[in-house]
Amino acid sequence: MLYNINDLKVGSDQDIILLIKCVEQGESQNGAYQRLMARDKQNHEIAIMNFTDISVKFKEPTVAKLRLSTQEYKGRISYQLINYVPVEGAVISDYLPKSKVNQADSWNYLVNTSKNLRPCLHKLVGMVLSANSTEFKVKALGPYKAFSRRNGILEATVKLTKLADFTSQILGLDRDLMLAGAMMYYVGYIDCMDDAFNITADDILIGAGTNTANRIKTQVQKILSGNDEQLKMSVDMTDVKLLCHMVMSRYKGIQPATAEAYALRYLDAMVTEVDSVETALSGYEPGSIITPLYGYGKLVKR
């Protein structure tokens, strides 16, 4: 039994246990087929073609024992499914990219930072993050490139918040608004990723910015419809509108209209682009010159 994709030998049929991240349906001149995206515990990923009469129907994502035919086709290795059996009791998270941060420390940093915000912003940040804390702490920011690993949303949020803190002081911006916006900037991504870190329809149809703004509005409505009159009076609708604008005025979003929104937009680009490059270079030796990768042109591993 194999567990590492790199151990598969060309020209033979072998058994291997992998995580099936997603199953795509397709149609060719020869009939219907399936394309399975699979990964092992060593962060290797492959596409497996299923041209058999056996339709892969299990609920994805799923860990399974796969019988594969491995052949060379047009200078590349081709993986074709022969059959499969789901593995009972397997832990999906064991197959996903590992975290680079301490989850508890990162979460505590956000909690402690939010305590110093003005009352309305403090309450909103606490309500939005607490309402989605489990997924917010665990999920990746995306399926590949920047922070495509466990705790990715949390890790990116902490880095963006720290940058927002220094930037607001250097540029004389509204520090509380900047910090609140930074702490909620990525929360909408929890709707854009599934448990195996695949993108969902929300990522394409709605987007993270709109998802985040909707979550802010939901918590505001809870406050306004509640019985705590003092809390209701603390709600500053101007701050709420500015927050919603900030989280939506990102790349792939609306045009920024405030200094704080512009600052967060470029800080977001800094945080995500730097991590994307670091991720792209992670598998290379120091001094390597890498041909155009991930749209960044040629890169050099320092």
Indicate residue ranges for each PLM-predicted region.
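Structural detector for short beta-strands of small beta-barrel domains
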Residues: 11-27
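Short nucleic-acid-contacting surface segments enriched for D/E, G, S/T with interspersed K/R
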Residues: 14, 51-67
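Beta-strand/loop nucleic-acid-binding surfaces
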Residues: 33-58
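OB-fold/S1-family single-stranded nucleic acid-binding modules
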Residues: 69-100
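Acidic/His-rich, divalent-metal-binding segments that scaffold phosphate/diphosphate chemistry
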Residues: 90-203
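Divalent-cation-assisted or electrostatically stabilized phosphate/pyrophosphate-binding catalytic cores
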Residues: 149, 197-217, 256, 261, ...
